[in-house]
């Protein structure tokens, strides 16, 4: 799972921002890093920043990424104003899925199950919280944030023959600003 490149706008100013120049450069770097794998399956969140991050690798492999809502970013609660979304997210990131309630526990479980049920080696372009949801689901850790994943970091999971998912490698961490 790859976190998208840096977005051009923050969570409190845009619902679906594109990548900025640095984000586009990060996308090319991760594509160059993964090019030799030559897998046959790419999945991306429907959000622009993930689709744009997937483009360089998909082009190298001559693939069309499959857009899946199952790997989308955590939804903000209904009724939270755009300008208040970042405050909600930063507060949520300090706690657990259980603190947020059953809707969010279900989000974590659904994204973990989706990844667990993928049968072939796949690159998934997704989001900070979504990738952490899978990490937590695999490790049995209820915290929203387990890894401070940098933009375009690569987190590797492995699925065994019986369908068990394990964390092989956490992505590169940084003091990522959630904006």
Predicted features and spans:
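Active-site-proximal alpha-helix that buttresses catalytic centers in soluble enzyme cores
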Residues: 1-68, 91, 95-100, 145
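Acidic, low-complexity terminal tails and accessory targeting/binding regions
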Residues: 63-67, 73-85, 120, 136-179
């Amino acid at each position: 799972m790859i976190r998208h490149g840096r977005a051009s706008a923050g969570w409190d100013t845009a619902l679906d921002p594109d990548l900025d120049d640095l984000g586009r450069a990060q996308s090319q770097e991760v594509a160059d890093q993964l090019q030799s794998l030559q897998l046959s399956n790419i999945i991306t969140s429907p959000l622009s920043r993930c689709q744009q991050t997937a483009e360089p690798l998909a082009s190298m492999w001559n693939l069309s990424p499959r857009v899946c809502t199952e790997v989308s970013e955590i939804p903000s609660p209904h009724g939270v104003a755009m300008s208040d979304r970042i405050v909600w997210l930063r507060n949520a990131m300090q706690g657990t899925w259980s603190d947020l309630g059953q809707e969010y526990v279900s989000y974590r479980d659904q994204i973990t199950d989706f990844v667990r049920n993928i049968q072939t080696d796949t690159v998934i372009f997704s989001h900070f919280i979504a990738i952490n949801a899978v990490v937590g689901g695999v490790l049995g850790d209820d915290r929203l944030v387990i890894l401070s994943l940098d933009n375009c970091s690569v987190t590797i999971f492995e699925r065994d023959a019986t369908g068990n998912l394990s964390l092989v490698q956490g992505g590169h961490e940084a003091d990522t600003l959630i904006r």
